Amino acid sequence: MEKIGVIVTAGGAGRRFGGEKPKQFLELSGIPVIIITLKRMVNLPIVGQVVLTVPENYIEVAGDLLSRYNLAGIKLTAGGTTRRESVLRGIRALTGNFSIIAVHDGVRPFFPKGALSEGVKKLSEGYGGAILAVPLRDTVKEVKDNVVISTLDRSRLYAVQTPQIFRREALLKGHALGEKQHLDAVDDSILVELCGETVAVIPGDYKNLKITWPEDLEFAEFLFTRYFAKELL
């Protein structure tokens, strides 16, 4: 089995979440969110190396957590001022010459365990990348100044998740473009798309929550206790 490199991004300051510390260091049943994510990731046979990016002022905190939870094999690096910069720093920190690289949000601890393997299968079919996505369940309106402008065709709209899996050369090409044009990309697939690569979609999971707002933490606690705690406790 070909091993892949994984970048886990936890470089955000969590301004939308509020509180004294970034959301990735908050706990579910006493375990930091980022540790749950990393524990589940490193246990996958397909993963050859994991690089974790965190805010520079949290390097020491993150290092202590990795040691405490027996994750010292994970390489730690400081994130940049944007997500794109953080991912690029993570790519550069990989020591293995991986032909496939996955990028994952550190605050998505409940990713499907088969996602990476499914993504690799898509790449073998000639795609430059593969992303997880789920169909939108709600009607979506375009709104300006609190007035509806249009109703979008929900059947064609998907909510994108991570991990996202890419051929190394496609991801590097995308980030080179992003760096050159100073693009503030919301995810990595858009950079790969802008380079002319085709990105495949594989089924995501509605439980693959990105912890962004304070109310997400309560729901994440429920999901962890109900579905995922047995993997770690």
UniProtKB/Swiss-Prot annotation:
The record marks R16, K23 as: Transition state stabilizer. The record marks R154, K210 as: Positions MEP for the nucleophilic attack. It comes from the Bacteria. One of its GO terms (molecular function) is 2-C-methyl-D-erythritol 4-phosphate cytidylyltransferase activity. Transmembrane segments: none annotated. It is an enzyme of class 2 (transferase). GO terms for biological process: isopentenyl diphosphate biosynthetic process, methylerythritol 4-phosphate pathway. Its EC number is 2.7.7.60. It catalyses: 2-C-methyl-D-erythritol 4-phosphate + CTP + H(+) = 4-CDP-2-C-methyl-D-erythritol + diphosphate. InterPro entries: IspD, IspD/TarI, IspD/TarI_cytidylyltransf_bact, Nucleotide-diphossugar_trans. Keywords: Isoprene biosynthesis, Nucleotidyltransferase, Transferase. Gene3D superfamilies: Spore Coat Polysaccharide Biosynthesis Protein SpsA, Chain A. Pathway: Isoprenoid biosynthesis; isopentenyl diphosphate biosynthesis via DXP pathway; isopentenyl diphosphate from 1-deoxy-D-xylulose 5-phosphate: step 2/6. Belongs to the IspD/TarI cytidylyltransferase family. IspD subfamily. NCBIfam families: ispD. Catalyzes the formation of 4-diphosphocytidyl-2-C-methyl-D-erythritol from CTP and 2-C-methyl-D-erythritol 4-phosphate (MEP). This is 2-C-methyl-D-erythritol 4-phosphate cytidylyltransferase. It comes from Carboxydothermus hydrogenoformans (strain ATCC BAA-161 / DSM 6008 / Z-2901).
